[in-house]
């Protein structure tokens, strides 16, 4: 401990000012899009909406088409909105907590809980904690969610509302879920509760650098199981 304190003291004396924000692009990266700011574009969208105005509640059609193409999802199941997937997930959780579906808000339940894949993303944990949702961990393995651990947690706790995870290049350890793992995850959680939600934070969907495991788009896997309602994917 003394050695650590001494190291900390030395670093503190350097008066460093370092931005450690994760995922924040460098100015050189931002410069790549400078020309987009000066292009003259038609402000009227393909469906007649004036893009300079408020837009559409579920997003402009062009953005939804792009998102559907990236996700291999149906466009009528794709929403484009907000500045980040994190904000969309927060709004979804808040809506379920306060209002629920069919007038069944989570806030009325006794100790509503959520499963968190670990190691995981601290912002996921902070959102759940802020809503007062009890968190239970579920381990990761080389193929994705540790299904044995998942079954143990679902058997032990009666009021789990959903699970949150990063299915591709999982934070911070990098797991890429196999198709079999995702399919079994959906089957298990669907059997546990038909209103269970799997929040797949697909922040790294297109961020492959080295050779990476092939992963069938989650909407296609979920559709084949009749589990689209259980799978909420954010990018």
Task: Locate the predicted segments by residue.
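N-terminal "arm"/small-domain region of PLP-dependent enzymes with the aminotransferase-like
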Residues: 1-72
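Conserved core of the PLP fold type I
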Residues: 49-194, 205-228
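Residue-level marker for buried hydrophobic side chains located in beta-strands
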Residues: 198-199
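Walker B catalytic acidic pair
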Residues: 202
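Conserved small/polar residues in nucleotide/adenosyl-binding loops
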Residues: 233-235
């Amino acid at each position: 401990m003394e050695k650590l304190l001494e190291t900390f003291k030395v670093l503190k004396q350097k008066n460093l000012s370092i931005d450690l924000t994760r995922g924040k692009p460098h100015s050189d990266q931002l410069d790549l899009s400078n020309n987009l700011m000066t292009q003259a574009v038609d402000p009227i969208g393909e469906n007649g909406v004036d893009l300079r105005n408020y837009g559409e509640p579920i997003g402009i059609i062009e953005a939804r088409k792009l998102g559907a193409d990236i996700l291999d999802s149906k466009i009528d199941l794709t929403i484009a909105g907000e500045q980040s997937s994190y904000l969309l997930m927060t709004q979804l959780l808040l809506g379920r907590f306060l209002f629920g579906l069919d007038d069944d808000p989570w806030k009325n339940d006794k100790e509503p809980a959520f499963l968190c894949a670990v190691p995981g993303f601290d912002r996921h944990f902070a959102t759940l904690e802020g809503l007062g949702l009890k968190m239970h961990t579920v381990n990761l393995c080389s193929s994705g969610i540790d299904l044995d651990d998942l079954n143990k947690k679902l058997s032990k706790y009666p009021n789990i509302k959903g699970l949150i995870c990063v299915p591709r290049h999982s934070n911070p350890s990098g797991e890429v879920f196999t198709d079999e793992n995702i399919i079994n995850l959906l089957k298990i959680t669907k059997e546990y509760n038909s209103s269970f939600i799997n929040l797949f934070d697909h922040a790294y969907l297109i961020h492959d650098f080295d050779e990476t495991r092939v992963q069938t788009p989650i909407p296609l896997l979920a559709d084949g199981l009749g589990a689209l309602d259980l799978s909420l994917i954010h990018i």
